[in-house]
Amino acid sequence: MSWRSEQIWIELIPGSRRGSNFVWAFILFFGSLEFILVGTASYFSQNLIAFFPQGMVMIFYGISGLFISLYLSSMLFWNVGGGYNQFDKTRGVICIFRWVFPGRNRRLLLRFFMKDIRSIRIEVKEGFYTRRLLYMDIRGQKAIPLTRTDEVLTPVEIEKKAAELASFLCVPIEVL
């Protein structure tokens, strides 16, 4: 989702709050509860499975699954990776904001001047898992990714996005 005018372009980044992450957290939580229930029932001689070693392993896997589902749920709650990209022509500033894990530096805010942007770069990696990424090259700094690594874009979509951004920022496009 994005909002655009003549002078400002704001692009919202969803982060970890995606439908697939909610589904996996739900499946993992209830699956690990089932593992714990089966392991506990075997301990109390319900004759489902033998407690040693199957019941112990089931309890171990259940507890591990609960910890992983807790981690996934906390990522969803904190919206890790979410934020926005703001391109402001009036002030000549680009702001990239992301939420990260809680702590002293929970907010990640990068600011750059528009005059320091060299180009918008499209990087294509072919192979079994084809990736197309959009970067912003800045003088004296590393390239900053503008798309998520797990975001699958067709060649037409990535070219359109790069062309719109390059024309808005008045910079060239590089393809690697």
Swiss-Prot record:
Family annotation (InterPro entries): PSI_Ycf4_assembly
Protein topology in the membrane: Multi-pass membrane protein
Location of this chain's protein in the cell: Plastid thylakoid membrane
Keyword entries, A-Z: Membrane, Photosynthesis, Plastid, Thylakoid, Transmembrane, Transmembrane helix
Taxon lineage: Eukaryota, Viridiplantae, Streptophyta, Embryophyta, Tracheophyta
Pfam families to which the protein is assigned, alphabetical: Ycf4
GO biological process assignments: photosynthesis
Main function: Seems to be required for the assembly of the photosystem I complex.
Similarity remark: Belongs to the Ycf4 family.
A GO CC term attached to the entry: photosystem I
Protein name listed in UniProt: Photosystem I assembly protein Ycf4
Annotated TM spans: 22-42, 48-68
Keyword Thylakoid: yes
Keyword Thylakoid: yes
Native species: Cuscuta gronovii (Common dodder)
